[in-house]
Amino acid sequence: MDDFKQAILLLVVDFVFVIILLLVLTFVVPRLQQSSTINTGLRTV
């Protein structure tokens, strides 16, 4: 049972890690796109 619990814990930890990564990506990517568009706008000007 201990091995079983450890396996479940590993699965849960991986699952949470992936969710956090996805959340961070969804928050960071739009900001990066905004900053990149601002940078290109400054370069053209």
From Swiss-Prot:
Membrane protein topology class: Single-pass type III membrane protein
Major subcellular site: host cell
GO cellular component terms, A-Z: host cell rough endoplasmic reticulum membrane; membrane
Protein name: Movement protein p5
Transmembrane segments: 8-28
Compartments where found: Host rough endoplasmic reticulum membrane
Signal peptide feature range: none
Keywords assigned: Host endoplasmic reticulum, Host membrane, Membrane, Transmembrane, Transmembrane helix
Species the sequence originates in: Grapevine leafroll-associated virus 3 (isolate United States/NY1)
Role played: Transports viral genome to neighboring plant cells directly through plasmosdesmata, without any budding. The movement protein allows efficient cell to cell propagation, by bypassing the host cell wall barrier. Two movement proteins, p6, Hsp70h and three structural proteins, CP, CPm, and P64 are essential for cell-cell movement. Also plays a role in virion formation. Together with CPm and p64, encapsidates the 5'-terminal portion of the viral genome.
